[in-house]
C-alpha cells in the first residue's frame, strides 16, 4: 500500500504536494503555518485539506503498523501463504484487515477448537464436501472417548463449520455491505416508558434505512436507547417472514460453500451461522458504524458553527458595559476599557428600576462607555429594555446596545483562568466581564472557554468526546491564526492557540511582557525563555506588533520574507512606511520580478496583498439584530409576525434563530430560500442577522417554526415539504399521523430538544 498514492487520490493532489506536506508535518510544522507560508511546497493545499491529510496520514500509518503485527503473528503460526500476505498488504482499511486476521487471531478455546482437538475436523470436511444425507451414519466413524455418540460428533462438526463460515473474510465483507445498504433500523418504545420518554415520541415506532439515516435522528434514537426509553434493532427482512424461510443472507452463505438446497443439516448450520453468529456481530458493527458516521456529521456541524461564531466581526476597541442579567441575584455589571481591562463593577436590581438607571448612568458617564453588551439569558429582555432607556436618555454619549450570547460565561467565571485573572472579583461578576469582552472581540474572549461550552453543538454530549475535542481545537487554532493576535495585548489563552506555541510558552510571553514592557519587534520574542528559532519560525507570522520599530511586524508578512520586501522598497525607491497601505504604489509592483527558488508567486502575491492592507482581518463588518419591542416570551409571538434575529446554530436540516424569546426558532432547510438548498450553510451561518416570519408556535413543547421566505403563508401548501415526514411514516410501517403543523416542524421532533445543551 502506497500511502502517498492513496492520499494523492483522496485529496486530488499530486504526489509531490503530498510528499512535501507530509515532510513538513513530520518536521513539526503546524497546519496554519504550512497553509499560509509554505504554499509553494504544497501547491497551495489549504488548512482543510491539510487537516484531512494529517488525519488520514495517521490512520494509514496505524494501518501499516497493524499489518506488520498481523503478518508477524500469522508467520509465527506457520500459516502465512503468499496469497494471504498479498491480501493483507492490499487491505485499505482496518476492518478488512481484521476480517483477514480473524481465522488466525489468538482466541480463547472455542467449541470449534475443542471439536478439532477431539478429531472432528475430518468429519466437518466430509459433511461439507460430500453432503451425504445420512449425517448420523457419517458421524459413526468419528466416535471416541471424548465423542460418545453421533449427536456429539455432529454438534462438534457444526461448531467447526460455523466458525469456518463466520471467518471467511470475503463472505463477511459481502454480507456486511449488503446489510448496511439494505437493512432498516427499527426503534420501539420500551413498554411502560411512554410518559417518561415523551420527548422521544417520534421514535416510539420508527423505521428507516440505516444507511441514509440523518445524524440528528441517529443520535436521537441512540440517546433514547441509552436512556432506557427505546429498543433498537436492525431489520433485514419483513417482520412477518416465516422463521423457516431462508433469508437472502443465508442463501449467500450457502452459495459460497456450495451447500445444496436439499441438505437440511447443512442448511440448518448455515441458518445458525447467520442468525446466531454473523448477524449479531454485523448488527453491532452496523450500529457502531451508524454512531461513528453520526458523530462525524455532528462534529462537522459543531466545528462549522464554532468557526462561524469565532469569526464573528468584533465591535471594536470601545469602552464597554457588560450586563449579566438576573432576577433574584440582580444584574451583574462590569465596565471594561477599549483594551478589555476591567475598570468598574456593580450589581443592580430590575425591581429597583430608578436606582438601576441612576447607577448605570453614572458608570456610563464616568468611564465614557460606548457599547452596552447584554447577556441573552434569564431576564435578558427586561435588562435590554432598561439599556434601551439609557441609550435614548443619553444621546450625547452615542451609546449602542447589543444582546450577545452568554453561553459559557458562567463556566469561565468559575474557571481557574478567571480566578487567576480576577482573584479578588466575585465569581458572579466575572461573567459580566466576559460578556463585555466577547462583544469587543469574540475570538479573543471565547478562546478562554472550552469550545464544548459555547453552545453551538448538535448532540454534543452524545458524540465521541476525544474526536470532538480534537476537531474543535483545530477550528480554534485555525481561526486564531487566520486573524492573528497583537502580542502586546493578547491573553495567554489566546497566545497559546498561535502556531508553534503552547500554554507554557504563552505564559512565558506574558510574563516577559509584564516584566520588560511591550515588545517593540518580533525579534525580541527570541528573548522569551524556551522560545527558540524553530518556534519563532512557526509563530512569528501570526503575531502582530503595532507601533514597533519594524512596520512589517504589524502585518502577516513573515520575517523570513522581509528581504523580499526590502528589494521591493529598493526598486520603488521608498520606505516601508510609504509603501505599506499605499494601494497605488503596491499595484505598481510586478510580482514576477521578485520570485526566486525560495519564494514563488503565491508567496509574493500574499506579500503584496498584505502590504496593500496590512494586518487585514478576515472577519466581516460588525452587525447586530434589532429584536422587536414587546416580544419577550414565546407567548408574545403570533403567527405571521416578521422579526429580526440572529442565527445561533446551523444544522444539516436547517438553522436555529434567536428572536429574543429565550427559545430559538427553527427555519427548516426547505424554508431557507425559494431555491433548492443542499446545505443550509449555503444560505446562512452562525452569527448572521436574518429576517424571519413566524409560521407556527407550539408553546407547550417550546417549538417555533420560522421561514426566511417572507411571502410564505402559514399552513400554505406551497411550503409543505413532506419528503422527510412521508419517508418516516412510510418506513415506520404505521398509519401516518395527522400533519397540521407547518413544514418546519417536520424536522423539529428530536432536534428541537435544543441543540444548546
Curated annotation (Swiss-Prot):
Q: Where is the signal peptide?
A: none
An example Gene Ontology molecular-function term: structural constituent of ribosome
Basic and acidic residues composition-biased segments: 711-741
Q: Which GO terms describe its biological process?
A: nucleobase-containing compound metabolic process; translation
- Cellular component GO terms, alphabetical: cytosol
Keywords tagged on the record: RNA-binding
Q: Where is this region: Disordered?
A: 711-757
One Pfam match, given by its short name, reads HHH_9
Note the CDD domains from the entry.
S1_Tex (cd05685)
Q: Membrane-spanning residues where? A: none
Give every S1 motif domain span.
Answer: 640-709
Q: What PANTHER family does this protein's entry cite?
A: 30S RIBOSOMAL PROTEIN S1, S1 RNA-BINDING DOMAIN-CONTAINING PROTEIN 1
- Listed name of the protein: Uncharacterized protein NMB0075
Amino acid at each position: 500500500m502506497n500511502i502517498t498514492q492513496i492520499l494523492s487520490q483522496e485529496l486530488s493532489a499530486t504526489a509531490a504536494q503530498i510528499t512535501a506536506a507530509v515532510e513538513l508535518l513530520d518536521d513539526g510544522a503546524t497546519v496554519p503555518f504550512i497553509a499560509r507560508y509554505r504554499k509553494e511546497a504544497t501547491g497551495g493545499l489549504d488548512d482543510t485539506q491539510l487537516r484531512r491529510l494529517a488525519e488520514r496520514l495517521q490512520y494509514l500509518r496505524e494501518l501499516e503498523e497493524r499489518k506488520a503485527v498481523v503478518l508477524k503473528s500469522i508467520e509465527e503460526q506457520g500459516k502465512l501463504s503468499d496469497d494471504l500476505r498479498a491480501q493483507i498488504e492490499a487491505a485499505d482499511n482496518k476492518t478488512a484487515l481484521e476480517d483477514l486476521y480473524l481465522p488466525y487471531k489468538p482466541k480463547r478455546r472455542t467449541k470449534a477448537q475443542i471439536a478439532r482437538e477431539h478429531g472432528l475436523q475430518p468429519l466437518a470436511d466430509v459433511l461439507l464436501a460430500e453432503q451425504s444425507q445420512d449425517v448420523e451414519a457419517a458421524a459413526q466413524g468419528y466416535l471416541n472417548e471424548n465423542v460418545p455418540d453421533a449427536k456429539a460428533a455432529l454438534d462438534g462438526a457444526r461448531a467447526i463449520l460455523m466458525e469456518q463460515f463466520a471467518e471467511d473474510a470475503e463472505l463477511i465483507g459481502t454480507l456486511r455491505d449488503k446489510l448496511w445498504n439494505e437493512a432498516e433500523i427499527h426503534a420501539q418504545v420500551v413498554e411502560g416508558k411512554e410518559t417518561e420518554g415523551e420527548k422521544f415520541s417520534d421514535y416510539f415506532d420508527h423505521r428507516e434505512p440505516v444507511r441514509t439515516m440523518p445524524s440528528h435522528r441517529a443520535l436521537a434514537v441512540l440517546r433514547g436507547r441509552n436512556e432506557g426509553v427505546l429498543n433498537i434493532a436492525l431489520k433485514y427482512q419483513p417482520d412477518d417472514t416465516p422463521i423457516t424461510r431462508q433469508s437472502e443472507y443465508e442463501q449467500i452463505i450457502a452459495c459460497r460453500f456450495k451447500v445444496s438446497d436439499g441438505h437440511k443439516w447443512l442448511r440448518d448450520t448455515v441458518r445458525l451461522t447467520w442468525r446466531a453468529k454473523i448477524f449479531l456481530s454485523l448488527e453491532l458493527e452496523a450500529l457502531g458504524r451508524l454512531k461513528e458516521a453520526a458523530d462525524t456529521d455532528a462534529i462537522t456541524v459543531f466545528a462549522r458553527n464554532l468557526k462561524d461564531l469565532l469569526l464573528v466581526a468584533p465591535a471594536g476597541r470601545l469602552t464597554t458595559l457588560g450586563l449579566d442579567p438576573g432576577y433574584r441575584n440582580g444584574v451583574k455589571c462590569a465596565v471594561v476599557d477599549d483594551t478589555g481591562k476591567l475598570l468598574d463593577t456593580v450589581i443592580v436590581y430590575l425591581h429597583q428600576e430608578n436606582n438601576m438607571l441612576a447607577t448605570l448612568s453614572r458608570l456610563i458617564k464616568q468611564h465614557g462607555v460606548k457599547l452596552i453588551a447584554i447577556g441573552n439569558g434569564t431576564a435578558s429582555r427586561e435588562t435590554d429594555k432598561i439599556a434601551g432607556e439609557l441609550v435614548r436618555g443619553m444621546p450625547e454619549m452615542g451609546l449602542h446596545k447589543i444582546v450577545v450570547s452568554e453561553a459559557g460565561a458562567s463556566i469561565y467565571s468559575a474557571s481557574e483562568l478567571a480566578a487567576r485573572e480576577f482573584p479578588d472579583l466575585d465569581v458572579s461578576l466575572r461573567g459580566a466581564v466576559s460578556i463585555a469582552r466577547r462583544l469587543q472581540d469574540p475570538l479573543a474572549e471565547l478562546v478562554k472557554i472550552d469550545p464544548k461550552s459555547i453552545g453551538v453543538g448538535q448532540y454534543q454530549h452524545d458524540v465521541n468526546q476525544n474526536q470532538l475535542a480534537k476537531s474543535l481545537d483545530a477550528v480554534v487554532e485555525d481561526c486564531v491564526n487566520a486573524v492573528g493576535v497583537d502580542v502586546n495585548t493578547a491573553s495567554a489563552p489566546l497566545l497559546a492557540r498561535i502556531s508553534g506555541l503552547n500554554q507554557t510558552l504563552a505564559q512565558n510571553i506574558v510574563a516577559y511582557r509584564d516584566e520588560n514592557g511591550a515588545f517593540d519587534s518580533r525579534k525580541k520574542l527570541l528573548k522569551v525563555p524556551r522560545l527558540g528559532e524553530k518556534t519563532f519560525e512557526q509563530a512569528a507570522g501570526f503575531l502582530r506588533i503595532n507601533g514597533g520599530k519594524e512596520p512589517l511586524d504589524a502585518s502577516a508578512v513573515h520575517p523570513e520574507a522581509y528581504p523580499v520586501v526590502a528589494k521591493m522598497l529598493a526598486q520603488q525607491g521608498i520606505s516601508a512606511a510609504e509603501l505599506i497601505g499605499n494601494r497605488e504604489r503596491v499595484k505598481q509592483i510586478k510580482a514576477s520580478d521578485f520570485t526566486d527558488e525560495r519564494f514563488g508567486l503565491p508567496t509574493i502575491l500574499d506579500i503584496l496583498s498584505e502590504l496593500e492592507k496590512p494586518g487585514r482581518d478576515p472577519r466581516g463588518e460588525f452587525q447586530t439584530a434589532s429584536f422587536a419591542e414587546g416580544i419577550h416570551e414565546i407567548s408574545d409571538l403570533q403567527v405571521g409576525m416578521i422579526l429580526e434575529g440572529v442565527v445561533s446554530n446551523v444544522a444539516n436540516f436547517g438553522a436555529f434563530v434567536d428572536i429574543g424569546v429565550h427559545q430559538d426558532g427553527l427555519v427548516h432547510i426547505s424554508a431557507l430560500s425559494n431555491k433548492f438548498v443542499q446545505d443550509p450553510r449555503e444560505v446562512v451561518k452562525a452569527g448572521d442577522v436574518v429576517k424571519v416570519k413566524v409560521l407556527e408556535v407550539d408553546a407547550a413543547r417550546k417549538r417555533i417554526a420560522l421561514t426566511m421566505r417572507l411571502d410564505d403563508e402559514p399552513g400554505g401548501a406551497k411550503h409543505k415539504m413532506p419528503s422527510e415526514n412521508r419517508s418516516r411514516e412510510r418506513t415506520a410501517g404505521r398509519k401516518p399521523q395527522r400533519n397540521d403543523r407547518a413544514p418546519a416542524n417536520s424536522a423539529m421532533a428530536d432536534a428541537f430538544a435544543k441543540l444548546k445543551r
